[in-house]
């Protein structure tokens, strides 16, 4: 936020306001100690005080060590093929499943949106598909085989976030940045990049 507002500000390493947000800023040591920003809420508030907005990258996949993986797995809402990071057992969720979209948003809302987050960078919405095998496309989704519906993955994932945020509040504009798109996806406030 500071660099965007004034490109030379970032060079003011002695500035006490800037230094307090760097790890070990007081002694400029190379090792990292306790971060200056202690909580995500403090970081979001700091960016807002700089008259800027903040967005966060959110992936459509979960590792087996996470609570979300367990919840999605109990719904049979994980697609059974490898995604990023490779060879870690991480699986994309099934955005075609409305209950899975509800769960995905409930965690985003509780852990991120309620803190004041302004936008979403929805990454891996193709989704990333590692160790690709033809039979992976026979994986069942809520709407049938992945082969039949895989191109609509970004549409459904973006739809879920957009509709849930709009249902949560009309006081904050939805902004989604995504690297994957599908026809008509712009209606969900999706902006594609590549």
Regions found by a protein language model. Give the residues of each.
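Catalytic-domain carbohydrate-binding cleft regions of carbohydrate-active enzymes
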Residues: 1-194
């Amino acid at each position: 936020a500071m660099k965007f507002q004034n490109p030379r500000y970032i060079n003011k390493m002695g500035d006490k306001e800037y230094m307090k947000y760097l790890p070990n800023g007081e002694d400029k040591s190379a090792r990292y100690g306790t971060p200056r920003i202690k909580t995500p809420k403090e970081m979001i508030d700091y960016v807002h005080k700089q008259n800027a907005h903040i967005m966060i990258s959110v992936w459509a996949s979960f590792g087996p060590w996470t609570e979300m993986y367990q919840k999605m797995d109990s719904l049979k809402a994980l697609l059974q093929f490898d995604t990023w990071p490779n060879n870690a057992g991480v699986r994309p969720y099934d955005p075609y499943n409305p209950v899975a979209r509800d769960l995905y948003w409930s965690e985003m809302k509780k852990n991120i949106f309620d803190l004041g987050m302004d936008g979403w960078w929805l990454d891996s919405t193709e989704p990333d598909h590692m160790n690709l095998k033809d039979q992976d496309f026979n994986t069942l989704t809520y709407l049938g085989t992945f082969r039949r519906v895989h191109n609509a993955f970004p549409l459904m994932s973006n739809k879920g976030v957009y509709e849930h945020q709009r249902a949560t509040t009309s006081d904050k504009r939805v902004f989604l940045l995504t690297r994957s798109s599908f026809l008509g996806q712009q209606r969900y406030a999706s902006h594609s990049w590549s």
